[in-house]
From Swiss-Prot:
It catalyses: N-succinyl-L-glutamate 5-semialdehyde + NAD(+) + H2O = N-succinyl-L-glutamate + NADH + 2 H(+). Its EC number is 1.2.1.71. It is an enzyme of class 1 (oxidoreductase). This is N-succinylglutamate 5-semialdehyde dehydrogenase. Catalyzes the NAD-dependent reduction of succinylglutamate semialdehyde into succinylglutamate. The gene is astD. The keyword Oxidoreductase applies.
Length: 487
């Protein structure tokens, strides 16, 4: 069954949809989309369940969330394989995604208490108490690149805070979502606390525009995020958290260990077939002999990257992109850059018709006068050679995005100079820029987000503060204010 509403699995009343393994086009899931009527039912169910879920208290909610963690542990092999089949990612990588989902439980519980717990202090005016309360009913829109981990990063803190959830996953990964929600059901989550509606644009619009939502948490493209931001303008009572993409720069300056630098470049640009929002899209390398040596080594290494199906043995570094359409989009992006004057050092190729399998690409765009400020969401890295560090930083900042950025440099002074001037929410030094800690906030500025960082700071947008001044009994002050008499 496709949808989970008020604790019951049910078929969709909309049109038929399927999900295919992008590495071989095999259909692995069938269902029907949710209609606006079913979306209404899901929101109503969440509203009906919300107060009792909140009144269960944090400890009671945590007990059920920890039971979900046990379900993830018990079913991690099936979940990892399902993610691999539906996204095309290699099995080694989807195993790490499931591990991140399991780890999110403990991190979210810690974040709840540190960011949004309860504090009390005695003051001359009375006892000052800070509490946090849930917003109510929130929608979670999940992406396809991390169909388990990223929606999990919204759902878990939302539930811990006392919200109820209507989950709308990517239409490209419905099977993963169905399995995730079934594990919540097995964990004993009360009916209506989480609801699943599957579908495409119409289902998403029906949910996003629902008047009974108190918030919406979105991970996906900048284009869709901006449309949601416009839609929520004029609704200050609703919380909107947007986690979007980036045109992320990586600068190389004065690195002695070329092999290590090349490794970090590969991990930054080509992991997940370039389908991470933090992936490096633009690489800035110094002109001169040292830069030439690094580029030569990089070209050699990119050509040696193993690409293959999710279950290939030995395992590949890169699996399939999410779809054949995505693969063709990357070929078109490369052709556009070539037409602008870019020179391919390693040609990106669509390896097999009917699949999302592509080889990684590296293109020198130094000669391109005005580089398009686009997030090419795939394994295509743009190389720019620079002669001046300030020029490199200026070029790196020439983007409307601001998600991740990094520098590989032996000099800490160079890093601190870069850190002070770069505009991004994630800035790494001598580490791949796809690396982020769940114990830290995750988010960007500009077109990459709306100042609602997720990960450890997700707790912040899952609850609102309630400030109270309290006393155990009504009492008169030592003296009345001027002009008052109670005689």
């Amino acid at each position: 069954m496709t949808h989970f509403i008020k604790g019951q699995w049910q078929a969709g009343k909309g049109h038929d949809v399927t999900s295919s393994n992008p590495a071989n086009s095999e259909i692995i899931w069938r269902g029907q989309t949710a209609t606006a009527e079913q979306v209404n039912a899901a929101v109503d169910a969440a509203r009906e369940a919300q107060f009792d879920w909140f009144m269960l208290g944090f400890d009671g909610r945590l007990k059920i969330v920890e039971a979900y963690r046990s379900q993830l542990e018990a079913n991690k092999a099936e979940l990892a394989e399902t993610i691999a089949q539906e996204t095309g990612k290699p099995q080694w990588e989807t195993a790490t995604e499931v591990a991140a989902m399991i780890g999110k439980i403990g991190l979210s519980a810690t974040a709840y208490n540190k960011r949004t717990g309860t504090e009390a202090n005695d003051t001359p005016a009375g006892r000052a108490v800070l509490r946090h309360k849930p917003h109510g009913v929130v929608a979670v829109f999940g992406p396809y690149n991390f169909p388990g981990h990223l929606p999990n990063g919204h759902i878990v803190p939302a539930l811990l805070a006392g919200n109820t959830v209507v989950f709308k996953p990517s239409e490209l990964t419905p099977k993963v979502a169905e399995l995730m929600v079934s594990l919540w059901e097995k964990a004993g989550l009360p009916a209506g606390v989480i609801n699943l509606v599957q579908g495409e644009v119409d289902t998403g619009k029906a949910l996003a525009s629902h008047p009974q939502l108190d918030g919406l948490f979105f991970t996906g493209s900048s284009r869709t995020g901006h449309l949601l931001h416009q839609q929520y303008a004029g609704h200050p009572g609703k919380i909107l958290a947007l986690e979007m993409g980036g045109n992320n720069p990586l600068i190389i300056k004065g690195v002695a260990d070329i092999k290590a630098a090349v490794h970090d470049i590969l991990q930054s640009a080509y992991i997940s077939s370039g389908q991470r929002c933090t992936c490096a899209r633009r690489l800035y390398v110094e002109q001169g002999e040292q830069g030439d040596a690094l580029v030569a080594k990089l070209v050699e290494a990119v050509k040696q990257i193993k690409v293959g199906p999710w279950n290939a043995q030995p395992q590949p570094f890169m699996g399939s992109m999410i779809s054949e359409a995505a693969a063709k989009g990357m070929v078109a992006a490369q052709a556009n850059l070539q037409n602008l004057g870019g020179v391919s050092l390693v040609e990106l190729s669509h390896l097999q018709a009917g699949t999302g399998l592509v080889s990684p690409g590296l293109i020198d765009v130094t000669a391109v006068g005005e580089l398009p400020d686009e997030e090419y969401f795939g394994p295509l890295l743009q190389l720019v050679r620079y002669s001046d560090f300030d020029q490199a930083i200026k070029l790196a900042n020439q983007t409307r995005y601001g998600l991740s950025a990094g520098i590989l440099a032996d000099s800490r002074d160079d890093y601190e100079y870069f850190l002070a001037r770069i505009r991004a929410g994630i800035v790494n030094w001598n580490k791949q820029i796809t690396g982020a800690s769940g114990a830290a906030p995750f988010g960007g500025v500009g077109a990459s987000g709306n100042h609602r960082a997720s990960a450890f700071y997700a707790a912040d947008y899952c609850a609102y503060p309630v400030a109270s001044v309290e006393a155990d009994a009504v009492s008169l002050p030592a003296s009345l204010s001027p002009g008052l008499s109670l005689e």
